[in-house]
Amino acid sequence: MKLLFYFPFLFVLLHASAQHKKLFIAAGQSNAVGMGDSALSKMYASAKTFEYRFTGDSLKALTDPVGYSELHFEKANTGSEWPAFASEYSILTGNEIIIVQAARGGSSCNNKAELNNYGTWDEKGNLPLFDSAVIKIKAAEKKTRTKVGGIIWSQGERDANAINAQQLTAAAYQVSLETLINRFRKALGAGVKFYIIQTGYYIHHPREGFDAVRKVQEAISKQMKDVYIVYNETGSFEDRGWMKDEIHYNQPALNDIGRKIAMQIIQTEKKKL
């Protein structure tokens, strides 16, 4: 598993002499949308962080609630990990950061796990989301004249529940996630990096399906090039008191995710220099 570890003293500004833009995609289901508290993410407001809005083809300051109800995607209710992520990344690199939010609560990776019109990232389903994501991403690339720097993926809870319900196998989930990564790379470029926030647990529900999803995510990070687990602490959130409810992360958790994935992503980029 390509799991990275952060040591504070290792990080320096990568591009101190010039201003650069970085475009990141926030994709997945409800914990990617964000179900936290915007009052607890306000401290991450920055003049160098932005969100792309497809409606109106515009950039806006990145503040919670991040996201917009467009192209079947949703906005945070009311806090997310993205202000903390973008702020930390910008501080450590000096770059301007643009977030493209492409997440929908309850969406599945495999269409066998899809619930009604909650959406799926699979090739077929009641509400396929992939094409909408690509439309939004390409519009953002054109607007900012910047290619995607990476896709940050927070998803798996819906598929874990389907595995628990014996509607889906772990092997089928793995195929669907691998296929999704390859579809993104075909649409956006073969070198697009895929960063996984490892799925946590559903309190008071069986863990078997969630363990299966977590193991698949680890396996894919070992087997596929430029796929990384950039956060693996979600399994301890219940013990830390970092759950908003049985399935969603609270704002302290989201802030922690945001800061640490910024550090980990920078570390992957430094290794490529």
Regions found by a protein language model. Name each.
Residues M1-H20:
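Bacterial Sec-dependent N-terminal signal peptides
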Residues Q19-L273:
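Cell-envelope and extracellular/periplasmic
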